[in-house]
């Protein structure tokens, strides 16, 4: 079944196909397609017991949205090139902030909160997924997305490499292609998240206004390249309604959050602040998928 309508506390489902036999009087549906993040951001503090660690713990608590956890995927560590300073790195070793300064600096708390808000923002964006796969037949807004090296036809996305991932060299030019596989026009947007949690709008192209994409029509942006090696996540959004540009502005930009009115716009606006709008049910006239591309250094396999 697919979601046909969403109310304040209920959702109406429509069967995707005629039932084989008689249905019981009462059915229970379990939502399994949305990936809501935790209310707080788990951060590990890899520092020895000291006044500096105590100051880091206090600053982390003061953010209001991050909590200390030994299993956190984001870690606070000693800076490699600045004695006494604190750095922020991801669990995979990616350095997210080479130095946040010393823990006793007056501005340390603000720098820490800003760096962690970027991490939380990305978690919220990734949690917009409505499908765990790009070929989900039950998706109300099916969109085929392909992020690959330049040179392929719009309808012929190259196969993934070993391990089910795509690897693209740093010097290669890349193309992002989306195709509306549904039966009605939809607005399609593509966001790119780099290894350092910076977020950029890939589609619509710079300077273009968003237009509904007709069924079976590709929309492409070519000639792009990666800035650094590592994992890039691409969030592909398909919506029955256009999304205000304000909703894509990241924290620190000028925008009117109150103008974000549709459920998807409200979720995007909240995610830009590193939080989730609890008043929005994460279902509606939109869908989202996430794909990952590994940008490899020159000479890497």
Label the model's feature ranges.
Residues 28, 36-301:
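Secretory-pathway glycoprotein ectodomains that are cysteine- and/or Ser/Thr/Pro-rich
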Residues 1-39, 199:
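Beta-strand/loop-dominated core regions that host nucleotide or nucleotide-derived cofactor-binding catalytic loops
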